[in-house]
A protein has these predicted regions:
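Phosphate-coordination/substrate-recognition cap region in phosphate-metabolizing enzymes
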Residues: 49, 53, 92-183, 194, ...
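Cationic, amphipathic, low-complexity segments that mediate targeting or membrane/lipid association
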Residues: 2-22
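Loop-to-helix element that buttresses phosphate recognition and phosphoryl-transfer chemistry
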Residues: 65-125, 199-215, 257
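Beta-strand elements within well-structured catalytic alpha/beta cores of enzymes
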Residues: 57-61, 108, 134, 229-243
Length: 305
């Protein structure tokens, strides 16, 4: 019963989060049609007499290189920390944002150490450790099920390139599940103790990540953007790919070709409907050294498995 209520609540929140901001904006316009809307910190304003929309800034940042990234292991929900290179990438993300005149006023992260540490290092480099922080398991990396902890190259040799590519990059085919009593199952991690075991994933495809991420987007991140915040989301390759798929309306097939470099901020300017104001290639949204970021993304694509 608890699980059923949890799922029902999430679906209700999803629908409510999708409709309320537009509802409020519409009736807010009717109430204040004789005067321009109040300006919001961090948002561009439209001078009186001109038409247009206010924009919100969203920055997505994949965590810096982790120890299991370096070892080419399927990481998933394992709580790998950053390597020295990963710490350097995270620290460099702060100046990259500052150079682009991006100053986050609220932070959202997953519950995993590599994302949390990346966020702290990036904000510390900007002298902005004070910004409010919200964390959610819904921003966690995709759970790789029974593949978690396995070497990607060895997994390819064992199961074949096509099978591993299907597990890794297909939109709706998850890897084999973990058994409930497997010590790798997230129910044994105290940070998820308040969640029912049946809600916690034992394996996920990207479609599953989209489904569990979107309620958090609508109910927690969108309200911060609506309030005028410059929002920084520090998460993982697949949870951020899920969000980018939603923002850029990428097809189920084409999302397989999207690869995110570690430690590179990606900026989106969104209109009041939370749609990107410009259709840009992802590489055009990178902050910092765009060529280095592109090379890093290509390296991700070449990983075995």
């Amino acid at each position: 019963m608890a699980v059923a209520k949890k799922v029902e609540r999430d679906h209700n929140n999803f629908a409510r989060g999708r409709s309320i901001p537009r509802f409020q904006r519409f009736f807010g316009f009717l109430r204040n049609s004789s005067s321009p809307p109040p300006s919001k910190p961090g948002q561009a304003t439209i001078p009186l007499g001109q038409t247009g929309t206010m924009t919100s800034t969203l920055v997505l940042l994949r965590h810096g290189q982790s120890t299991w990234n370096l070892e080419n292991l399927f990481t998933g929900w394992y709580d790998a920390d950053l390597t020295d290179q990963g710490r350097a990438e995270a620290s460099a993300a702060g100046p990259a944002m500052a150079a682009a005149d991006v100053a986050p006023t609220v932070l959202h992260t997953s519950m995993q150490t590599r994302a949390i540490r990346t966020a702290n290092l990036a904000l510390d480099a900007m002298d902005r450790l004070w910004v409010p922080v919200r964390r959610s398991w819904r921003l966690n990396e995709r759970h790789y099920g029974a593949l978690q902890g396995m070497d990607k190259k060895e997994t390819t040799e064992k199961y074949g390139k096509d099978q591993v590519f299907e597990w890794r990059r297909s939109y709706d085919i998850p890897p084999p599940k973990l058994e409930l009593d497997d010590p790798r199952h997230p129910r044994f991690d105290e940070r998820y103790a308040s969640l029912p075991a049946d809600v916690l994933p034992a394996s996920e495809c990207l479609a599953d990540v989209v489904e569990r991420m979107l309620p958090y987007w609508y109910d927690d991140i969108v309200p911060d953007l609506d309030a005028g915040h410059t929002v920084l989301v520090v998460a993982h390759g697949n949870s951020l790919r899920a969000l980018i798929k939603h923002l850029d309306a990428i097809s189920d097939a084409d999302i397989a070709d999207v690869n995110l470099p570690t430690g590179v901020p990606i900026r989106f300017e969104l209109d009041d409907a939370m749609v990107p104001t410009k259709r840009l290639a992802l590489t055009a949204r990178y902050l910092g050294d765009a060529e280095a970021a592109k090379a890093a993304a290509e390296a991700v694509a070449r990983q075995a498995g």
